[in-house]
């Protein structure tokens, strides 16, 4: 592939960077005997040479396009590598693409009542994680501020109704300061800041922010 690219660059340099002999020929027309000659004949000759020069230029461009197409049509040709190579050869200025945002996880992971704001939890910034996911049922955890779960909730209720709020609200009871959490297999009502690691029955993790 590197050999093909080198040949392509050599072809461009040979055909487009060298001096055009026809252009030189136009600038060095021989003088007639005694310095005379027909002006109309000179104009006709110049027009013919200009037409020939244009024809040769088009032929060179067609040959170059054909060479590029042949390289593109090879089965092992890597277009991305070619574009990268062409970009580097056309300019010495490197433009760095903006870095994508790096995902962050809570450490430790906190649950809390509605009085605690949600966000990325750390030892110094105690916030409730709002990107929780259950590794048991592979559901994202939903939470409802100022609600608690009714004591009659069971596994089948969440299994059949998650994550539709209009179905879940039949088991939600208003309670100021509480926050009701649930996935398809587990549920909790939390009022105080709680480290998730202290609840060994829950298989919830931070799904990254």
From Swiss-Prot:
Domain of life: Eukaryota
Location of region: Disordered: 24-58
Tissue: Expressed in multiple tissues, including the brain, kidney, lung, spleen, heart, trachea and testis. Expressed in the retina (at protein level).
Annotated InterPro entries: CFAP418
GO biological process: photoreceptor cell morphogenesis
Primary localisation category: cytoplasm
Region (Required for interaction with FAM161A) residue spans: 1-76
Gene knockout outcome: No visible phenotype. However mice exhibit progressive and simultaneous degeneration of rod and cone photoreceptors.
Name of a matching Pfam family: RMP
Alphabetically ordered keywords of this record: Cytoplasm
CC annotations in GO: cytoplasm; photoreceptor inner segment
Location in or out of the cell: Cytoplasm; Photoreceptor inner segment
Biased composition (Basic and acidic residues): 40-58
Record's subunit section: Interacts (via N-terminus) with FAM161A (via central region); the interaction is direct.
Free-text function comment from the UniProt entry: May be involved in photoreceptor outer segment disk morphogenesis.
Protein name listed in UniProt: Cilia- and flagella-associated protein 418
Organism field: Mus musculus (Mouse)
Species classification: Eukaryota, Metazoa, Chordata, Craniata, Vertebrata
């Amino acid at each position: 592939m590197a050999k093909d690219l080198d040949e392509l660059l050599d072809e461009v340099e040979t055909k487009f960077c060298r001096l055009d002999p026809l252009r030189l020929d136009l600038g060095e027309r021989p003088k007639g005997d005694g310095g005379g000659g027909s002006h109309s004949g000179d104009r006709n000759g110049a027009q013919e040479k200009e037409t020939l020069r244009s024809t040769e230029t088009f032929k060179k461009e067609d040959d170059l396009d054909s060479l590029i197409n042949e390289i593109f049509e090879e089965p092992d040709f890597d277009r991305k590598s070619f574009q990268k190579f062409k970009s580097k050869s056309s300019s010495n200025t490197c433009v760095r693409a903006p870095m994508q945002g790096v995902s962050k996880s809570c450490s430790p992971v906190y649950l809390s009542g509605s009085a605690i704001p949600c966000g990325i939890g750390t030892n110094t910034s105690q916030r409730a994680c709002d990107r929780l996911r259950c590794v048991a049922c592979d559901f994202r955890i939903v939470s409802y501020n100022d609600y608690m779960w009714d004591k009659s909730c069971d596994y089948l209720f969440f299994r059949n109704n998650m994550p539709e709020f209009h179905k879940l609200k039949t088991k939600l009871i208003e309670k100021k300061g509480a926050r009701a959490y649930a996935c398809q297999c587990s549920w909790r009502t939390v009022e105080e800041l709680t480290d998730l690691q202290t609840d060994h029955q829950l298989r919830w993790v931070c799904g990254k922010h």
